[in-house]
Regions:
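Loop/helix-junction capping segments adjacent to catalytic residues or to phosphate/diphosphate-binding pockets
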Residues: 99-100, 177
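Bacterial N-terminal signal peptides
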Residues: 9-18
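Alpha/beta-hydrolase fold nucleophile elbow
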Residues: 163-171
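Bacterial N-terminal signal peptides that target proteins for export
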Residues: 1-9
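Short beta-strand element of the alpha/beta-hydrolase
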Residues: 86-94
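Lipolytic serine-hydrolase domain surface
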Residues: 27-82, 95-97, 103, 107, ...
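Gly/Ala-rich beta-loop-alpha elbow adjacent to hydrolase catalytic centers
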Residues: 171, 175, 179
């Protein structure tokens, strides 16, 4: 059965890649036009404290750049988060990402979104300090704590976008953890005592939100009615999550949460929330925790892209 699953994934990925290539070619965009049409932004906290307890709600001192004609150029937060009719898609990367790698990753995601998009969008990456250090387990624990604290910035960004009719969020690994925490804080929840000092406006949002998680490094119970991020789904229209029951990193997730028997949602899937559609990608990606393996080898990632783009056909193209 495992072999049949891998054969299915190989066939599905081939079809997915061929369709994507044809769609790009049909756009008639040469390389230069492709660069000029990008609307990709970076909001960075890499120059700030790793694990903030609070942020300034008026001016959180974020650094902003826009990818324009082949290079990253300085911009303002007002420009990055303006509501101009385009669909805002916010991406939060995972662990052990240098600044340059994060920038390359968001451009790769933009390529895949553009191949399936039927509407204009604005892709905004929240880049946080997650580079690799000499001690992997200790550094992963520190970055997990940092991703929890950076939920404050996700919540702040969501509040700036609160008047957008639709918002999409994509997170990989610890980035998914930041997104879930940010949604929880924006809805009035608390994490490690942060809420009282955030200054985040928790008035009801006008936005409908769609979320895509890839290998989420968070406990599978956190989105249950009594979970740590229980308010995260308050304004969420739907969550599509990809996990890998062969993930060698998330299999050891319990070591991140000291004194617990936690099981990662990216390893065994979420429990206790009917808003979540999820797929086990182990037959496709195998023993890895590499985000790019989901992009290249998992046909279900196409569903995530459609979900984030609010494509009308997403309900009809589910892969069972």
């Amino acid at each position: 059965m495992h072999r049949l699953g891998r054969l299915f994934c190989f066939f599905a990925v081939s079809v997915f890649c061929n369709l994507s290539t044809r769609e790009i070619q049909a756009d008639g965009l040469n390389d230069q036009e492709s660069l000029e049409c990008r609307d990709v932004w970076e909001i960075s906290t890499r120059h700030l404290m790793d694990r903030p307890r609070c942020i300034d709600p008026i001016d959180p001192a974020l650094r902003v750049h826009r990818f324009d004609t082949g290079c990253w150029q300085e911009a303002t937060i007002e420009d990055a988060l303006q509501l101009d009719g385009r669909l805002p898609i916010v991406y939060v990367h995972g662990n052990f990402m240098t600044h340059d790698n994060a920038r390359r990753r968001v451009l790769l995601i933009d390529d895949m979104l553009r191949a399936r998009a039927h509407r204009s969008y604005r892709l905004i990456m929240l880049s946080w300090p997650s580079q690799r250090e000499p001690h992997p387990l200790r550094d992963t624990r520190e970055n997990a704590a940092s991703s929890d604290s950076h939920s404050l910035y996700v919540a702040w960004v969501l509040q700036q976008l609160r008047d957008a009719p639709q918002v999409s969020l994509l997170g990989f690994s610890l980035g998914a953890r930041s997104i879930s925490g940010g949604l929880h804080l924006a809805a009035g929840g608390t994490i490690r005592g942060l809420h009282g000092a955030t200054g985040v406006n928790t008035e009801p949002s006008e936005s409908l939100v769609r979320v895509g998680f890839v290998a989420p490094a968070m406990d599978r119970t956190w989105l249950t009615p009594s979970g740590k991020h229980r308010l995260a789904t308050q304004h969420v229209e739907g969550i599509l999550s990809l996990y890998n029951s062969d993930d060698p990193v998330l299999r050891r997730f319990r070591f991140l949460e000291s004194g617990s028997h936690a099981i990662a949602a990216g390893y065994q899937g979420f429990v206790g929330n009917s808003l979540i559609r999820q797929y086990d990608c182990s037959d496709c990606v195998g023993r890895t925790h590499d985000e790019r393996s989901y992009f290249r080898q998992c046909p279900y990632f196409g569903l995530v892209l459609d979900h984030l783009l609010w494509n009308e056909s997403v309900g009809a193209c589910r892969i069972q």
